[in-house]
């Protein structure tokens, strides 16, 4: 076995496939392109390739002395896996085994497990012989090597002896017992580079040592222009991305269940309101014989909940006019009360400009300038309507329908219209007219139309199958037409490119030119089709999904850091929390690629995170180290994130905050699906390159030549090529050799004839 080991190329795909052939699972090899940037943890070890020049090689052979960095203690050397390289061209396998067999927590497989158990306590020379006499390792090694060219005997005379002595050599850098060791099979002992700092990782010290070695950090290295390559042995990215996708999809289902729970509470409240309206309609129909004056007194004597002002009949009529429909929308038109005699009301006179009710955007969008069209601005200026909005009360399930979806119809002469509107919503003073019944019928019709539109849109998206989102099953329940949302939450095959600004699809003011250019040009987050559908069901199609800015990102601040590593929990009272496992806080220290991009996108100018919408984040193939995977750095995280993430009780969030968290989860799912797809495609490319590298083309060449001979074309081709070479060679030789002799021969006879 001492002969026949072939040279291996320094290629991460080759080493990854070699690790798989050894039987190791959950490990891959990646190439490091930049020594200045921080490496993503965890890293099992580094494999460093450099050019082994004759001068250096001779010096190493002569220099058998031990320097101060060499470890000569036999107990320490024999305790680690350090083997002398006794076979030529086996340095690649030696470097890989030095990393794998000195690392705990790696599933080695049967071959390497037996090797590690057999060589335990051996000296470096005995371990080197054990590697050389392992046929499994030699077979796996040579299966990924390029076939050596067969040199003809006459061609070997021109090869320089100096050039044959130049070669490349692999060494490994491994952390062992909190110290950095350099394991070189051509050295007698391991090299101890010492411990690393408290505030750094072992990879930081290894990068410094490698930079000093190749002459980047110091100018004393004579071979500063040496060719080198650096590879890292890291965990398999596919397993990591699959586990994160599994957790994210479970958390998406939990958030959808929380939204469904809120929706069911809304349906129950609307059912109670409908039953109360029906009861009052029956009471009003049975008491039609009573004089109108008595009814007016009953209206005035209706009890009002404690803590509220006494409403006048006019205020009660205004409040009743804004009764919510079953779809959850506030109706802005009010019907005047009939006179006592039952006569039709007089024709309405044009109201002065101070009392004009301007049709406005919903309350949660009205104070945003970018959500208004220029025509809306002109109407506001003409009507004298201010943009200021009083602060919102804390979230409550009872106030959900009124605080989130109440329409702001302010007038210049009335300052407490919102208070009167809430009083009108809660007192239910309409006992005489059929306004409640008409509103209920209109609400049922609007809700049925909304349900039909949602069903058609879901069917259309399922037929196209281009968004890759999970379809929502929408059905109506009961006589009130409540909507139930269910989702299968299956993995989407491709990330969605659909815009989450659902209002832009129905022609609202979201595409207003007043939106600032900075927000338009900012990097946006991937779309969330599931959140889009849920937003339409919860808030109505006309209002659209609200832009989830800093006011609605409380759930993202609390749970966004842990949503990809910890499963969320939902209680019966609607409280959502994340159990803080040990790996959740450890994940905060791990920095890297993708999640860092997300946090940079989601952080506003003031440091506040902001969930944005738009197409998927673009990926670069070089970023697919988990620096590819990009987690936020610990120092960049707000302190409230860590504090809130460790709170076991959890919090209760509004529907808009849950939608913001749902969009965040959908964005993570889309990104990790892209990363997983890239890793799978990378493995396929590794196998294709390996087949091209190791393929023996001799059989194909022999078959092709035999086919040419059978067709009678081989002789003519050979004769044609040989004749061309002879003609070119002979003509050139004669021109150079016969010029001077011809001149001499011709000159002598010419002179003789003249004489």
Curated annotation (Swiss-Prot):
What are the UCH catalytic domain coordinates in residue numbering? 4-235
Report the gene knockout effect.
Neuronal hyperplasia, suggesting a role in Notch signaling pathway.
Query: Which GO terms fall under biological process for this protein?
Result: cranial skeletal system development; heterochromatin formation; negative regulation of DNA-templated transcription; Notch signaling pathway; protein deubiquitination; protein K48-linked deubiquitination; regulation of cell cycle; regulation of cell growth
* Residues annotated as site: Important for enzyme activity: 184
Residue ranges annotated as compositionally biased, kind Pro residues, are: 342-351
Q: Where is the composition biased (Polar residues)?
A: 483-530, 637-647
List the residues marked with site Transition state stabilizer: 85
Q: What is this protein called?
A: Ubiquitin carboxyl-terminal hydrolase BAP1
Originating species: Danio rerio
Gene name of the encoded protein: bap1
